[in-house]
Design a protein with these regions (language model features):
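Gly/Ser/Thr-rich active-site cleft segment
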Residues: 9-11, 122-180
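A broad, structural surface signal
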Residues: 48, 52-59, 63, 111, ...
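Short active-site oxyanion
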Residues: 73, 97-98, 152-157
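Short, flexible active-site-adjacent loop segments at beta-strand->alpha-helix junctions, enriched
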Residues: 81, 90, 104-105, 164-166, ...
Length: 180
């Protein structure tokens, strides 16, 4: 018999659940992690905490279900969408905390884009509303405000993604840089 692990990497905790071939829960684990609020309206997570809680909760779920890792057929990840980060392409080290989906630090930049008259264009091209929730303005903030980020990105030394991308990259030992 094989098993599936479902990982829910959420905003305040990570939960992993092992299911059998009838989709019955056979093991689970959950861990909370620290949120960081460096300024008003800012919300960040340490990416290493996110990865550590995924690994720890998977181990707890396997132990809880008395399952061996080699019995796992697949792993699925659901995560806090639009939480974004950069990490070093070689070492895997994050260059800054992950900026959480709730973060509002790019509100003024979004307002400027609106006043410049590009909101409709952005929505037409992306299908998304102009809002700090989405990754693009966070990406710009990271490039503009994290020392060395822009030059490292231009040199091809950084990877960017949402939390699922970061987790997949680390769980595959840097083989896969992907998202859904």
């Amino acid at each position: 018999m094989g098993y599936i692990i479902a990982v829910d990497q959420g905003t305040t905790s990570t939960r992993s659940i092992v299911f059998d071939d009838q989709f019955a829960i056979v093991g689970q684990g959950q861990e909370e992690f620290e949120q960081h609020f460096p300024n008003s309206g800012w919300v960040e997570h340490n990416p290493k905490d996110l990865l550590a809680t995924v690994i720890a909760t998977c181990k707890k779920a396997l132990n809880d279900g008395k399952i061996r890792a080699k019995e796992i057929l697949a792993l699925g990840i659901t995560n806090q969408r639009e939480t974004t980060l950069f990490w070093d392409k070689v070492s895997g080290e994050p260059i800054y905390n992950a900026i959480v989906w709730q973060d509002r630090r790019t509100s003024k930049f979004c307002d400027k884009l609106r006043s410049d008259g590009v909101e409709e264009l952005i929505t037409r091209i992306t299908g998304l509303l102009l809002d700090p929730y989405f990754s693009a303005t966070k990406l710009k903030w990271l490039l503009d405000n994290v020392e060395g980020a822009r030059s490292k990105a231009e040199a091809g030394e950084l990877l960017f993604g949402t939390v699922d991308t970061y987790l997949i990259w680390h769980l595959t030992n840097g083989v896969m840089h992907a998202t859904d």
